[in-house]
């Protein structure tokens, strides 16, 4: 089920409707303007000249002087001086900016009632003008604070002062929708976690023999191995409240927010014990203290200290189990991993072939499959796939099926989806004839060495269709998972990596930049053989690691090298020696099988993609040239 549908977070404060507030402000401005003009007598607008004429004619009964503005009324017997001849009791006009000394004398002579008003606003108007700016400033501050809180709290949870509220998702009993039946391929992990489920269901059975519930369980595994799904399955099986939060949700821009959220989260879990509290990606707050760029007083360390304190503070009757997931257990603080905090560590490995088949069966429950679909074959071709990768494979196959307007997902769709994930999507890149020939020989070098070297992974297919960031690909499909790598296997693997560059060299007498990735991978592999795996006779059974950790991962700012400059020189010499020997042997191998190389490259230019059966058919029809003539051909090709 969807997390968003099942989660029941605390009710959020109703959002402010800023449109209504804007209309209120505009209405207030209108009222102020209207009240300011309300004291002025309404009437027809006339010119100052017309006003003077009416005054001389004795038609004006009363005037009100307010600055430059003049308003008044006519005698009842009089009329409004207008061309249309309409009667009007009142009028208004504006005096010119210069002084008119005759006006007051004329008003007195005609017996006009004169009333004067001050230009200064009234007392209540002055109060509004003085207070309104402060209201606007305070409103702006409140609005900015509210928006900041919305961003940090996911919608304003907790009110204006609710930064310390943990943005935790709460799943009710029975609403998880995930059980151990929905999690395949991690049987060992499920066996360890089933004890926790049994304890939460029947604690008395365990307490009778003096057993205590583990305070914390750390789920360790690569990304996509099902750590979060397994945690939800534990809550679904146990039937207890389940709280879920990400480690990054604790850290904000304000000091102390992380620790406050930890307290709030643990308080909520304790109130509904027995319950399960799940912290995803705990390495974001649980990294080793006193290291990295933050020093010993950053916000992350305060949050970690609060987590440690809360886990120590559980009482015996508080059946709260803390589940945490990480793919970087090496950067976690040792105090977090000691017994009494995270008592149990559950490791989730990549699934093997049988486990992959079970995972595929789970993810294809609601997918209509064609009769030719063999999930065991799909599992055999997906070595190294995690549970999330397999779910993505099924979804990609379904998407391709929908694009083709088919009603069932067949085996071809699974093959296309796998190629898209492993090799990359096809690119509409048109290569010139020379470049296409170059790429064909490069990939043929990889494919031929993979086919000839006895310890190399079996060849699956070779293609010169641009995919992803590569102009061509050679795919090897190991028959089974390798958990330990022999020296012979690694040397043959290096030979396959260098085969493309060597093929360019012996065919065109030059090398290109297309082997950049191959050289980088080969150098890294040779360095690990020498420095970490003791596969160099000159270095012997010793390990010399050169740290590649970054400061932000929680390691020291500087890690001293644990070997001398002389040893470093020997390491570099050994790496260079291994690569040179592999290059020489691979070059001799391709020279001896030059006819196969040429035939494969020619067929690849025509067909663009060849599978293993087609490659072997090409090789069976090739007769190798005599060694003397073959060397002459190589020399000619090299120029």
Curated annotation (Swiss-Prot):
Domain of life according to the entry: Bacteria
Cytoplasmic side: 1-15, 145-639
Keyword Cytoplasm appears in the UniProt entry: no
Membrane topology category: Multi-pass membrane protein
Cofactor remark from the record: Binds 1 zinc ion per subunit.
Gene3D superfamilies tied to this protein: 1.10.8.60, 3.30.720.210, P-loop containing nucleotide triphosphate hydrolases, Peptidase M41
GO molecular function: ATP binding; ATP hydrolysis activity; ATP-dependent peptidase activity; metalloendopeptidase activity; zinc ion binding
GO biological process: protein catabolic process; proteolysis
Biological function: Acts as a processive, ATP-dependent zinc metallopeptidase for both cytoplasmic and membrane proteins. Plays a role in the quality control of integral membrane proteins.
Subunit structure comment from the entry: Homohexamer.
Protein name: ATP-dependent zinc metalloprotease FtsH
């Amino acid at each position: 089920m969807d997390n968003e549908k099942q989660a029941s977070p605390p009710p959020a404060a109703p959002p402010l409707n800023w449109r209504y507030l804007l209309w209120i402000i505009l209405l207030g401005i209108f009222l102020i303007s209207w009240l300011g003009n309300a004291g002025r007598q309404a009437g027809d607008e006339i010119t100052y000249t017309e006003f003077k004429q009416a005054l001389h004619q004795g038609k004006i009964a009363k005037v009100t002087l307010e600055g430059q503005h003049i308003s008044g009324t006519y005698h009842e017997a009089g009329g409004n001086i207008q061309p249309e001849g309409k009667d009007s009791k009142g009028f208004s006009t504006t005096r010119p900016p210069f002084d008119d000394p005759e006006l007051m004398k004329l008003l007195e002579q005609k017996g006009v009632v004169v009333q004067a008003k001050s230009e200064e606003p009234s007392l209540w108007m002055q109060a509004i003008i003085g207070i309104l700016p402060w209201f606007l400033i305070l409103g702006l501050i409140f609005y900015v604070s509210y928006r900041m809180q919305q961003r940090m709290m996911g919608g304003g949870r907790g009110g204006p002062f609710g930064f310390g509220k943990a943005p935790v998702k709460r799943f009710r009993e029975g609403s998880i929708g995930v059980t151990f039946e929905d999690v395949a391929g991690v049987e060992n992990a499920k066996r360890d976690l089933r004890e926790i489920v049994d304890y939460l269901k029947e604690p008395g059975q365990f307490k009778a023999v003096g057993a205590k519930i583990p305070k914390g369980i750390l789920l360790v595994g690569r990304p996509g191995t099902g750590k979060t799904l397994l945690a939800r399955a534990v809550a679904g099986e146990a039937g207890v409240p389940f709280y879920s939060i990400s480690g990054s949700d604790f850290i904000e821009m304000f000091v102390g927010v992380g620790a406050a959220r930890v307290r709030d989260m643990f308080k909520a879990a304790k109130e509904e014990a027995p319950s399960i509290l799940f912290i995803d990606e705990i390495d974001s707050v649980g990294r080793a203290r006193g290291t990295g760029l933050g020093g010993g007083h950053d916000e992350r360390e305060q949050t970690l200290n609060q987590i440690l304190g809360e886990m120590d503070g559980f009482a015996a009757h508080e059946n709260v189990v803390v589940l945490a997931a990480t793919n970087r257990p090496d950067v976690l603080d040792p105090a977090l991993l000691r017994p009494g905090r995270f008592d149990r560590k559950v490791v989730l490995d990549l699934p093997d072939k049988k486990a992959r088949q079970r995972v595929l069966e789970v993810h294809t429950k609601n997918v209509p499959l064609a009769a030719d679909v063999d999930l065991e074959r799909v599992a055999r071709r997906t070595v190294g796939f995690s549970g999330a990768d397999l779910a993505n494979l099924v979804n990609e196959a379904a998407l391709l099926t929908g694009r083709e307007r088919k009603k069932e997902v067949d085996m071809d769709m699974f093959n296309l989806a796998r190629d898209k994930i492993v090799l990359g999507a096809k690119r509409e890149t048109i290569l010139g004839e020379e470049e296409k020939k170059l790429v064909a020989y490069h990939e043929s070098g990889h494919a031929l060495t993979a086919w000839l070297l006895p310890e190399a992974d079996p060849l699956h297919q070779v293609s010169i269709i641009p995919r992803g960031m590569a102009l061509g690909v050679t795919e090897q499909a190991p028959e089974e998972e390798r958990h330990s790598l022999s020296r012979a296997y690694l040397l043959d693997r290096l030979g396959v990596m260098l085969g493309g560059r060597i093929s360019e060299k012996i065919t065109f007498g030059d090398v290109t930049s297309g082997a950049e990735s191959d050289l980088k991978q080969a150098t890294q592999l040779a360095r690990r053989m020498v420095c970490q795996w003791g596969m160099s006779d000159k270095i012997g059974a010793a390990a010399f690691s050169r740290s590649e950790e970054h400061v932000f991962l929680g390691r020291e700012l500087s890690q001293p090298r644990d070997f001398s400059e002389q040893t470093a020189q020997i390491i570099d010499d050994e790496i260079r020696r291994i690569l040179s020997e592999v290059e020489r042997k691979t070059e001799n191998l391709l020279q001896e099988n030059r006819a196969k190389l040429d035939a494969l490259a020619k067929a690849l230019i025509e067909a663009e993609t060849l599978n293993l059966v087609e490659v072997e058919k090409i090789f069976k029809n090739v007769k190798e040239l005599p060694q003397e003539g073959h060397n002459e051909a190589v020399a000619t090709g090299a120029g």
